[in-house]
Amino acid sequence: MISFEDFLLRPSKVVDPFNRFVAKIDPFLTLVEFCQVIGPKPLAVVSQRPDDKIRGVDINDMAIWLMSSDTVPGTMIVLENNQTGVYAAAYYFNLYDMRARAFQRNLCIAYLCSEKPTKETLNLFSSAMKKLVSPVLICNRRLFIRHVTDIVKFSDSVDETTLKQYYTLNGDSQKLSDGSRFNVVFEQTRLLKSKFLTKRFQEMAFDDDICCGHNAENMNEAEDIICSFRVPSIPLSPVETLTPCAYSSIIPKLRQLCSELCSSGSPNRNSTHGALFCGHRPIATTSPAATTTLPWNTDSGKSDNDKNGEETLKEVTGHLGDVIFPLLCGEDLVVCGAEQRKSTVEDMLGKLSRVVPRESARNVEENIKIEKDPNRIGNGLGGLLCNRNETGKLARWRNVLDMNRSALKTFTYDGSLLAGLNKKRKFPSDRSLVLFIIAYLTNICQLAFICRYMFIKSPNSIEKALGDQQKLSSDDERILINLLMGIDFEKFNQLKVSSKDGAKPSRTINL
């Protein structure tokens, strides 16, 4: 499918002779199963229209397209159908069934739309899938273990000699093979029991656990499952019988998720048409003509700590580039301080979080919690309460802003993009300094856009893309790559270099 951006920015690309511009479809969610008898088939469709009707797309063709991808259960991928112009964010998982091939039945939940899903949409879909599928999987695993345990117990009660005599006295040649077939089933079932009955599986639990446990023994059902192997033509059980406790909650959750995804992907939502944001302000937009619907609030760089008289950011104006460089290149940075300096640490965290480029304007308002346990600190920017003599807690971080000693532990920055932030300047307040940093990063994003469009002609390196116009150091290249990943993660993720590759020795800067 040819986009308008291809005509404007990529004139060297061959124009599609079939002119495959397609009509826009309404976004919808679908649950698809790869049936071992008839192939991919849709089990449920959820949309915003009455009766969940879908226009402009063949749901059966979409089911075949979704299940044709080579994936691993538990993964999410983004697909693009060039013929129909449909994008899909698909999450794949499997349910265990005693009668299925390899005891597994593959399923997929996908969100289909005409526009490429944004990062906000993908994050929402990914987090929702984990919450939605977890109770389904745990119920299915417990029921499957119940069947395996009952079948093993049933097989132990069957005397092999008696079984052979029974089929030997019977003259039907078809039944002579049932004994060996049952033995194969019993052997495979015992292997499954040793595989699943582990301590890790027994301790598996989720917050939204609605499964009854399936602890009651049911030998009649186990006998029916064993007898069903004699007739291979018997159809498989419906999917809802494989997870009886949680299947009824799938459709209501999908309906709620569909409305959330449609609102997050709507162009009239309360966010802005941008790719990267600092303090509610777009520093990089997806197209030059894109405008923002978010009001330019003059208090966007103002934090709650400003009212308390905290002006911590002004004290490090001579090393601002060294402070924010780890965050701009995707590294972790920990701001630490003692209990007496907790307000200072909170103020520094709040202001640094407003100058870190983010993929969504909503994420700017998220407050970063200060932890006492270093193991609870996540990736990116974090806060830690520790005394001056507890330096052992900071050993695993390469970048530490120590408010106790007014020192910065980091690796040497060798570049020119942030040179303007390492000059000693005077600002009337931290708020004005935050706005200055946002404007400074906006100019850097303009260079990132040049790299984005010239990367098409020279996809091996950003330095080659720029040619002789401007020489970039490896540190500046890391900054631009991280900004490009924020603009388009799928296209520029391949350029990311591991932090362990070419790691430089750290140094301590007295602020």
From Swiss-Prot:
Places the protein is found: Cytoplasm
GO biological process: autophagy
InterPro entries assigned to the protein according to its UniProt record, in alphabetical order: FLCN/SMCR8_DENN
Composition bias, Basic and acidic residues: 301-310
Family, as annotated: Belongs to the SMCR8 family.
Role summary: Part of a complex that has guanine nucleotide exchange factor (GEF) activity and regulates autophagy.
Protein name: Guanine nucleotide exchange protein smcr-8
Organism: Caenorhabditis elegans
Gene of this entry: smcr-8
